[in-house]
A protein has these predicted regions:
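Conserved active-site region of classical short-chain dehydrogenase/reductase
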Residues: 1-5, 54, 133-136, 140
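Feature marks short, surface-exposed loop/turn motifs that line or immediately flank catalytic pockets
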Residues: 24, 77, 163-165
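Residue(s) in the substrate-gating loop at a strand-loop-helix junction
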Residues: 20
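Short aromatic-enriched loop/helix-cap "lid" or pocket-rim segments at secondary-structure transitions
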Residues: 28-30, 80-85, 125-126, 170
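Catalytic helix-loop patch of NAD(P)-dependent Rossmann-fold dehydrogenases
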Residues: 1-2, 9, 13-14, 23-75, ...
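Oxidoreductase cofactor-interface core, primarily capturing Rossmann-like NAD(P)-dependent enzymes
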Residues: 71, 82, 110-113
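Active-site loop of short-chain dehydrogenase/reductase
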Residues: 11-15, 65-67, 109-110, 151-155
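C-terminal substrate-binding subdomain of Rossmann-fold SDR/epimerase-dehydratase oxidoreductases
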Residues: 96-237
């Protein structure tokens, strides 16, 4: 609300909103497209994104000069390939890959895999992982596209690789790519976790001209390089 108010005061008409695939909750069909119901969030985080999107849609209806793009991220991972910029969670990571890298680096005793009885190939949750560099490029493409469109405008786009990988598959691939061992234990399900979700990214590809240029292997490799850079930096202090 504050951002929308300041935009109005300052005459800013273009908005790119960082939304999330969590607005879909547990989809009934996969891959999930932007046409799927977007009000079924199963977590508090997802619900905040649903509310945020609704506020923006209401603002566009009320202000016909406003243009907005809602980018629904799936699971961004990785870091800059040079290891200078990356994810630095405060406290215990809530996402899988930072927990993997911190465990491999010896900062955490073990990785807990939450749930092994989901209706997936190996019983663990399936997600759509994409490199953070691809997320960054999508923002640039969204801004350029939005500038060319008439107002009012409010369009949602999925940002995902278009394929799902299970938690076990990601851990195994990380170990293969980096040569690092990740101690792991089995734990109970986490409240709010959906079994599986991955994107139909057709709209992003056809409308924005966006594609995932980085695969899961490179994203995991860059995430590990970032973790190693953090370790080296802390050793010099």
């Amino acid at each position: 609300v504050n951002v929308l108010q300041v935009m109005q005061w300052r005459g800013v008409q273009d908005l790119v909103f960082s939304s999330s695939c969590t607005v879909y909750g547990q989809p009934t069909h996969m891959p999930v497209s932007e046409r799927a119901p977007d009000h079924s969030a199963s977590s508090p985080y997802g619900y905040t994104k649903v509310v945020g999107e609704r506020m923006i849609r209401d603002a566009v209806r009320a202000n016909h000069t406003l243009k907005a793009v809602l980018l629904r991220y799936f699971n961004p991972i990785g870091a800059h390939p040079e290891g200078h910029i990356g994810e630095l969670p405060i406290g215990v990571p809530g996402n899988l890959v930072p927990f993997i890298t911190q465990t491999a680096a010896g900062l955490r005793k073990q990785l807990t895999i939450h749930g092994n009885d989901y209706a997936t190939t190996d019983g663990t949750c399936v997600r759509d992982y994409l490199h953070v560099l691809d997320v960054a490029s999508a923002h640039v493409m969204a801004l350029r596209w939005m500038k060319e469109q008439p107002s009012p405008l409010c369009e949602a786009f999925n940002l995902g690789a278009g394929e799902g990988h299970s938690v076990k598959q990601v851990v195994d691939l990380f170990e293969e790519v980096t040569g690092q061992h990740v101690p792991k234990v089995q734990g109970p399900r986490r409240a709010g976790d959906v079994a599986a979700i991955w994107a139909d990214n057709t709209k992003s590809r056809e409308v924005l001209g966006w594609n995932c240029e980085h695969d899961l292997r490179s994203a995991l490799r860059d995430a590990w390089n970032w973790q190693c850079s953090l370790k080296e930096a802390s050793a010099h202090h």
